[in-house]
């Protein structure tokens, strides 16, 4: 049995996301807790937060995963963007606490030509400040690996390890592993040996106990292309055999699996969830 779900909309009211997750056949699901394309955010209404928590509890599905909005860039050398990014991260941690969401996934941003080391140092400082500003919390911040786009931070396991090492409250940080991003960054997930290799590297450098969520996406780009273009499960360059190897690895089978696959006529979210269960042998 695997826990698999997808990203669902909060349109209309955040508690409606739970019904959408149930309709899609989710065992677990991911949301943006607010508009992901803007900086401004309204305070979370306590009544709505309570309704969301009640709906999740009644549904029997979970854990719920929240994803940071698109604009924050905690690696940015631009002072204004950086400060807004720290504030956004602290604010989202507080929102997760109110909503009872245990995991917040964040991208690590782009260093804008300042260099990987400088970018990593900014990310570490941003996370340390955000944790302090947000206050004590059971919410775990999950660092997501990136696809290897120009100037991106967090592409390699070594990048992620160096960031984790610099964080003061290490018990509050984990990893979200995105299969599309890993493949685009050069990690070959098409074979059992390739899957074993990258998970072994994570275990050696970071510890598999920090791996808490998998973003399960096929990849439109070739191995090492740096192309962050998600594809339906089994229809991209990783392929069905690759996902069989991924899904049958014991370190993956125990985790919440979130599909962030395209919205088009070829396959629905429900179809991707069914395909994951098929390939997992569940």
UniProtKB/Swiss-Prot annotation:
| Residues that, per the record, bind Zn(2+) 1 | 67, 107, 144
Keyword Membrane listed = no
Coiled coil segments of this chain: none
> A Pfam family for this UniProt protein?
AP_endonuc_2
- Provide the binding site for Zn(2+) 3: 181, 228, 230
Q: What would be an example GO MF term here? A: phosphoric diester hydrolase activity
Q: Which UniProt keywords apply?
A: DNA damage, DNA repair, Endonuclease, Hydrolase, Metal-binding, Nuclease, Zinc
Q: Which BP terms in the Gene Ontology apply to this protein? A: base-excision repair
The UniProt entry, under InterPro entries, shows: AP_endonuc_2, AP_endonuc_F2_Zn_BS, Xyl_isomerase-like_sf, Xyl_isomerase-like_TIM-brl
Cofactor or coenzyme needed: Zn(2+)
Q: Which reaction does it catalyse?
A: Endonucleolytic cleavage to 5'-phosphooligonucleotide end-products
Name the residues that bind Zn(2+) 2. 144, 178, 215, 260
What is this protein for, i.e. what is its function? Endonuclease IV plays a role in DNA repair. It cleaves phosphodiester bonds at apurinic or apyrimidinic (AP) sites, generating a 3'-hydroxyl group and a 5'-terminal sugar phosphate.
PANTHER family noted in UniProt:
APURINIC-APYRIMIDINIC ENDONUCLEASE, ENDONUCLEASE IV ENDODEOXYRIBONUCLEASE IV
Q: Which HAMAP family match?
A: Nfo
Protein name, per record? Probable endonuclease 4
Organism from which the protein derives:
Methanoculleus marisnigri (strain ATCC 35101 / DSM 1498 / JR1)
């Amino acid at each position: 049995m695997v826990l698999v779900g997808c990203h669902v909309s909060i349109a209309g009211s955040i508690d409606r996301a739970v019904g959408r997750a149930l309709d899609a056949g989710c065992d677990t699901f991911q949301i943006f807790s607010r508009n992901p394309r803007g900086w401004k955010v309204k305070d979370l209404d306590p009544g709505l937060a309570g309704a969301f928590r009640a709906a999740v509890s009644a549904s029997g599905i979970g854990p719920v995963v929240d994803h940071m909005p698109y604009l924050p860039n905690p690696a940015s050398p631009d002072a204004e963007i950086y400060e807004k990014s720290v504030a956004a991260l602290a604010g989202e941690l507080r929102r997760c606490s109110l909503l009872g969401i245990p995991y917040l996934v964040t991208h690590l941003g782009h260093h804008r030509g300042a260099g990987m080391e400088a970018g990593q140092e900014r990310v570490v400082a941003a996370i340390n400040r955000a944790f302090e500003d947000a206050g004590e919390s059971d919410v775990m911040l999950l660092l997501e690996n990136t696809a290897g786009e120009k100037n991106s931070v967090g592409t390699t396991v070594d990048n992620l390890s160096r960031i984790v090492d610099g964080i003061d409250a290490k018990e509050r940080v984990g990893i979200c592993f995105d299969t599309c991003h890993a493949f685009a960054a050069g990690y070959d997930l098409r074979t059992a040996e390739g899957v074993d290799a990258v998970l072994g590297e994570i275990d050696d450098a970071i510890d598999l106990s920090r791996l808490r969520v998998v973003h399960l996406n096929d990849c439109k780009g070739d191995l090492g292309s740096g192309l962050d273009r998600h594809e339906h499960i089994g229809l991209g360059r990783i392929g069905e055999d690759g996902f069989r190897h991924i899904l049958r690895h014991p370190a993956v089978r125990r985790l919440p699996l979130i599909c962030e696959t395209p919205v088009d006529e070829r396959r629905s979210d429900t179809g991707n969830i069914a395909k994951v269960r098929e390939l997992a042998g569940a």
